[in-house]
Amino acid sequence: MADDRKALGRWGEQYAAEYLQQLGYQLIASGWHCRWGEIDLIAYDQATLVIIEVRTRRGTAHGSAAESLTLKKRQRLARLLQAYLQALDAAQTPWLGDYRIDAIAITLSRGQPQLEHFQAISIE
């Protein structure tokens, strides 16, 4: 069961990455880890650094993928963003531009992916 969830998550991240590239985002990393957790995707949207959380669900029996973006998870994303910015500083490549947190929710309905893209999500 856990392997199924991991495979679904990997599929969702790949699907989201392809979607973002079609929109013109430049993907620079995936699966970035630190002690606070993992950032699914990191990209540039023109001159803005964006970290992207991807949530993928099969059906809506336990709520939609979008509903799984709880306040606690959004606050964790804010910590992850700060950790990533600090890692850039430590690597002597500080980011001085704009940044934001996006979320992509993918719900499979009858095998068809339904994607919602939330830009600049609130952490409050």
UniProtKB/Swiss-Prot annotation:
The record's CDD domains line, in alphabetical order, gives: PoNe_Nuclease
Which superkingdom is the protein from?
Answer: Bacteria
Disulphide-bonded residues: none
Which InterPro entries does the UniProt record give?
Restrct_endonuc-II-like, tRNA_endonuc-like_dom_sf, UPF0102_YraN-like
The record's annotation in Pfam families points to: UPF0102 (PF02021)
The portions of this protein that span the membrane are: none
In its UniProt entry, what is this protein called? UPF0102 protein Haur_0145
Q: A GO molecular-function term, please? A: nucleic acid binding
The family annotation for this protein states: Belongs to the UPF0102 family.
